[in-house]
Amino acid sequence: MTTFYTVVSWLVILGYWVLIAGVTLRILMKRRAVPSAMAWLLIIYILPLVGIIAYLSVGELHLGKRRAERARAMWPSTAKWLNDLKACKHIFAQENSSVASSLFKLCERRQGIAGVKGNQLQLLTDSDDVMQALIRDIQLARHNIEMVFYIWQPGGMADQVAESLMAAARRDIHCRLMLDSAGSVAFFRSPWAAMMRNAGIEVVEALKVNLMRVFLRRMDLRQHRKMVMIDNYIAYTGSMNMVDPRFFKQDAGVGQWVDLMARMEGPVATAMGIVYSCDWEIETGKRILPPPPDVNIMPFEQASGHTIHTIASGPGFPEDLIHQALLTATYAAREYLIMTTPYFVPSDDLLHAICTAAQRGVDVSIILPRKNDSLLVGWASRAFFSELLAAGVKIYQFEGGLLHTKSVLVDGELSLVGTVNLDMRSLWLNFEITLVIDDTGFGADLAAVQDDYISRSRLLDARLWVKRPLWQRITERLFYFFSPLL
């Protein structure tokens, strides 16, 4: 019996080390950033069982077998749709400003289509204004409404949007609603999901959280887009979830969330529609390719509106494109660069690009919330401040709530707005969307919004920053080491 237990013990020990060696080899064989690989190896060697389980759960990008098959199956028809769209030459911009030219070329080469012109844009910075505009557009809808949000939190004006959407469905408007399973857990536990389905709305719970399938698909891969398309002509996107900030996370101690949304009319709705079509097919298996732009209702003269490129990210979309776009925009800056983000955990390449811009004389400003709803990201962000300040970057800490806006403005002409945070999760993992706008008028509007944020912020003093307590520095470095995993 003693011999039996000895053999079993040795087999367990052998299996244990074989498992660690196997996972280590897999990490080394994967083409990932060195900091990310080192962080995973550290976790595995310090806490082997926890580290191995964590890596197998969230260490690699697994969309899931069924969704991966759907993603592969949809691309031939999607590619044909994109190719057919090129015949509508009147919607595509032929030239761009000098500051935007490189970025638009990058997007065209990687996504297969050029930026679209003739769009009308309106920036909305107040949640009530966003929801009131959305309700009006829903009430005037004639054919179809598609929505996707990371969070739908019942309460306040969000309920009024829900009521208007159900009323639209009852008058035979085709309504589709896709919500992330994790972000909208409160919605799916409420009566609203059943009420909407009973009204005729197609409600889809995207990327369902299922602990039984934790090793088959990444549970932290989330549908983070916020988009609305109405009649293939009107579109919304930006940082705002379908929540009333007066009722959302009031116990988090960070104040009301501050967001920015763009309301658009024009062919950009078609570009966003194909993104929604891909998401819908990956999640449901149903194909809903949008119709081509209607030349009878859309103006396409270059001078009549804004030129926009839509960048979509996530499994099945051009890999690393949003990261490349941010790098390209940063290196294109000649006069000034302003960034706003709630979560700042940049890649080494993006951090280097930002610091280099400041060191070559560009006026670089980053606006972050002073209080963050994520303790981990809040501390990790602080670990980058010393390097940024040393390079001459101005860091503004917003004090008017949790600044949730994601925006970049380059030289007053090139703008990026959407759902992408400047962190690893947004850059390489989640389903995200960003608008790239080449227009001085829109740039002036965005600059006014950012100036308002700065007026409600405190400029971080580099001299005081270096005097912060030692325990804060140690905590920052600890979270910095794990920043590639956040």
From Swiss-Prot:
Keyword Cell wall biogenesis/degradation: no
SMART domains cross-referenced by the UniProt entry: PLDc (SM00155)
PLD phosphodiesterase domain mapped to chain residues: 219-246, 399-426
Annotated compartments: Cell inner membrane
Molecular function terms from GO: cardiolipin synthase activity
InterPro entries registered for this protein in UniProt: Cardiolipin_synthase, CL_synthase_A, CLS_N, PLD-like_dom, PLipase_D/transphosphatidylase
EC code(s) of this entry: 2.7.8.-
Top EC class for this record: transferase
Gene3D superfamilies: Endonuclease Chain A
Membrane topology: Multi-pass membrane protein
One Pfam family from the record: PLDc_N
Gene Ontology BP, a term: cardiolipin biosynthetic process
Annotated transmembrane regions: 3-23, 38-58
Signal peptide start-end: none
GO cellular component: a single term: plasma membrane
Catalyses which reaction(s): 2 a 1,2-diacyl-sn-glycero-3-phospho-(1'-sn-glycerol) = a cardiolipin + glycerol
Active site positions, chain numbering: 224, 226, 231, 404, 406, 411
Keyword vocabulary terms for this entry: Cell inner membrane, Cell membrane, Lipid biosynthesis, Lipid metabolism, Membrane, Phospholipid biosynthesis, Phospholipid metabolism, Repeat, Transferase, Transmembrane, Transmembrane helix
Function noted in UniProt: Catalyzes the reversible phosphatidyl group transfer from one phosphatidylglycerol molecule to another to form cardiolipin (CL) (diphosphatidylglycerol) and glycerol.
Family, similarity comment: Belongs to the phospholipase D family. Cardiolipin synthase subfamily. ClsA sub-subfamily.
Full protein name: Cardiolipin synthase A
Lineage: Bacteria, Pseudomonadati, Pseudomonadota, Gammaproteobacteria, Enterobacterales
Gene behind the chain: clsA
